[in-house]
Amino acid sequence: MELYIVYMTTELGEEVDACVQASSTSEAESIGMTMLEGGELQCDGVICMQCSAVLA
């Protein structure tokens, strides 16, 4: 498992990021989007319009 920072843009234009542990970039992005859709991040948007993950 590696530590990734996931950068996302919501449907409201908010830029949010999350730090997650995952085994790949695609898994990290999936975890980040799930967190966003589940309301776990401090933002008003819940739909991810753009997403990218980088190793921390």
Language-model-derived ranges and their functions:
Residues 33-56:
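Short, mixed-charge low-complexity intrinsically disordered segments
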Residues 14-24:
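A short, exposed loop/beta-hairpin motif centered on an aromatic-Gly-Thr core
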